[in-house]
Amino acid sequence: SQDTCRTWARELMSSTGNVSPDDAMQLATDLIHTGKLTTFQLNSLLEPIPRPLALGPYRIVDTLSDLLGLNWVQATDIHRGTSLWCIQWTRDDLQRPSYKAWPPSVDLAKHHSRIDGPALDRWESVLAEPGYLACFCESLHGQPLSQLLSQGPLSVESSIRMMRDTVSAIAGLHDQDLIHGAITPESIWKCSEDQFRMRRDPIIPPQSPYSASWNSVITTPEILRHATAAPEFTLPGTEPSRQSDLYALGVVWAHALLGRIPWPKSDRLDTNGWKKTHQQVPIELPASCPEPVARCIRYLVAKNPSSRFRDASQLAKAIASLDGAS
């Protein structure tokens, strides 16, 4: 606020004795050096249309665009002092064609904020005001599976551990009649040696991976999105479902074991090529994959949705039986 800025200016003049409040650059430099303002906050204030730096009980302190993508920022709860991740949009952001065609849903975000689980990211609030829309979640420590796989495939044992956690997360969503709709190596994070967690999009309703207006708060390369698209999405009007989530889990599992996208010629496929691949081509698995694991994956990626696991609970039981499969 202006009152706060004036207070900071008086504090600086009192402590240095030679800073004029008219010297904007010097004042800005000193505010940054004394921790009163971050470089990100200063740059935001200097934009032609400044983005809000205070949203309800939260203060926006830095960008997370390099880590998480466009519109992601780091926030601090001014009452608790905790650091959070925030996805935020201004009115201008929401005028983009993709958002106008498929707008965020505040009701969906409120639903997600009521659902918690040890293997799920935790969304705590959504703020919708005339000039902005923002969602806040606890920050995750670790790295996405996509980054982990750039160093090589997971061991069978580690992949089973990943699946136990992610299936637990998906079961928690499905039990509340929520579909994830964006399961890829970008949405699964390894947070410690023994724990994987699932990131979710709490505010943009799921839609077909082939949709021209597809959008998600989880920044996802198109190739990963298409690689996990269930065969039924080739039919017009097909919406994400529990079965398409299970299919995507199977593709991600195979991806983790191979260390690459588990479909032939994946780097050369266009949209029609991807649709034919999911309808006709068997998924690739490493030759060393134990048969019980391979059997689980094949059930998950069955071309016919009715041939897959019935639900996440049935899949969880199958994974629990894999002890010693490595």
Model-derived regions: residue spans:
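Non-catalytic accessory regions
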Residues: S1-H112, W123, E129, C135-C137, ...
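Conserved HxN/HPN-centered segment at the entrance to the catalytic loop
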Residues: D116-E124
